[in-house]
């Protein structure tokens, strides 16, 4: 089953609209995606503050007024920041769209960045950041990125309490001018997108004008080649658990083996009955859950294996992970297991067709990481349905067995190279 084809419409100023129409529900989703994210801006802390501040007040209304209008008209808005994307998403009812689109334009074009709201949001983000820095899963992810990309690399940037404290209102105003007003976004429309909705959305986007020399651009720095395996630990003295994150650099979407390798990784740890779950969770009881996935970004493609475990079992989890990789690479799986892998992987793919919102997300990912949405979806299906035990074994042997890997641990096993949180 193919991914529904999106309709692409050029707008003024070089902006493109990408739409998926489905009128089964009278709801539309508008996503405005700027091709710049945390790795690209001068200060990622300023970006994390600026985006939610957009709805805290404009030159003509307060943040409370904005919240009341959205709620009264059955609309809600959120912002998301990725490594190379900044996204504003708005869900709205078609019957109230005429009242919502002018509000959205005002939010985007004329934010006031009121000082009192800025201080409230600053304190909220500082508290959230400090809480996040006590979670071993997050610390292992951050350490893994430093190991893959290097300390200080754009792709390894994180927000911090001290960083939030240092951001001034003037920085937010400047970043808004350079990102929202000067950098060309893409408009994604999904749901009950009719001619009226399209026209209102496109009229709103026309008010942005053309990109200027103040525009920001993506700062993609490829990850350096990993020559040997490494293992580092972020020590969390009072932690009862250790987060394990194994990153194995691998091939990208342009490689002919890419989609076949995805299926092999799925068999290893991509579903509840996978090799890793069956052994490390069900048989050994070392963790409540362990997973493996392919994580592709503009900088690199990596196979990521991650879980949390009691400190005592950290080495056992690592050992059993290698056992399962070796077993997958050493002999073909049985017919029953192969059927489960095919069926579960295919069901997961088809689930992305459930709504126009999940469909349009495929096209947003295409912009974010460069994986072709429509053709990539077909190739993933073809490789899942044609998967053989021999091919899965071949992929595991070729790309998983003995390949250099970065093992990032965060917890309190006390036996690894310590890495400070400030690194």
What do the predicted segments below correspond to?
Residues 1-68, 89, 102, 173-279, ...:
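His/Glu-rich zincin catalytic helix
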Residues 10, 65-216, 252, 282-423:
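Charge-rich, well-structured scaffold segments of protease-associated domains
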